[in-house]
C-alpha cells in the first residue's frame, strides 16, 4: 500500500472515529487526526450564531477555515515525515477546502448507515456525548443530501461490524 491521506467522515454514530482509530493501529506508520480534537482546541472566543437561518450549525466561516487550515498543516507535516494520515470527523466544505490547500487527500470515504441505526447508536451514548434525535436526524440529512459529499465514496455501515468496515476501507486504499 502506498502512502496515503484518507478522509473519513459521516454523521454522528456512523463509526468514523472508531474505524479511524482501529485502522491506524493496524498500519505500520500512521496518524489519526480527529477533527473534534482540533475543533475543541478553541477554548474561548468561539463564534456561534444560532439565529442565522442560513447557517444552522452556528459556526462562523472563519472558524471552519481555521480548523481546516490547522488540520491540513498537521497532516502535511506528518505526511512529509513518511506517515500515512487519516483525518476523521465532521468538517464542512470550507474546512475540507482549507485542508486541501496544504495536502492532497488520496481517498475520501463517507460512512453513511441508515438513519435508524445512527439514532440507535446515539441513544446508547453517554449523556454528555449524545446529540439527541433531532440533531442526529439533521446531521444525517446533511450527509445524505449535501452535494459536496458526492465526491466521497459512500459506505453503508448499517449492518457492518467494525472489523468488516475496516476491511472495506483497506480494500479501497489498494
Question: For each predicted feature, which ranges?
Answer:
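P-loop (Walker A) phosphate-binding loop of NTP-binding proteins
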Residues: 11
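Conserved substrate/cofactor phosphate-moiety recognition/catalytic segment
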Residues: 21-66
Amino acid at each position: 500500500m502506498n502512502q496515503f491521506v484518507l478522509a473519513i467522515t459521516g454523521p454522528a454514530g456512523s463509526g468514523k472515529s472508531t474505524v479511524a482509530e482501529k485502522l491506524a493501529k493496524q498500519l505500520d506508520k500512521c496518524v489519526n487526526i480527529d477533527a473534534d480534537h482540533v475543533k475543541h482546541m478553541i477554548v474561548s472566543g468561539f463564534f456561534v450564531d444560532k439565529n442565522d437561518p442560513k447557517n444552522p450549525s452556528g459556526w462562523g466561516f472563519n472558524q471552519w477555515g481555521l480548523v481546516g487550515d490547522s488540520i491540513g498543516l498537521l497532516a502535511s507535516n506528518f505526511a512529509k515525515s513518511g506517515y500515512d494520515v487519516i483525518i476523521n470527523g465532521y468538517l464542512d466544505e470550507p474546512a475540507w477546502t482549507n485542508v486541501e490547500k496544504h495536502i492532497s487527500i488520496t481517498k475520501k470515504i463517507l460512512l453513511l448507515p441508515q438513519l435508524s441505526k445512527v439514532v440507535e447508536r446515539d441513544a446508547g451514548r453517554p449523556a454528555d456525548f449524545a446529540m439527541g434525535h433531532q440533531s442526529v436526524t439533521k446531521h444525517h440529512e446533511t450527509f445524505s443530501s449535501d452535494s459536496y459529499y458526492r465526491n466521497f465514496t459512500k459506505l453503508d455501515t448499517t449492518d457492518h461490524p467494525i472489523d468488516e468496515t475496516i476491511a472495506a476501507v483497506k480494500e479501497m486504499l489498494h
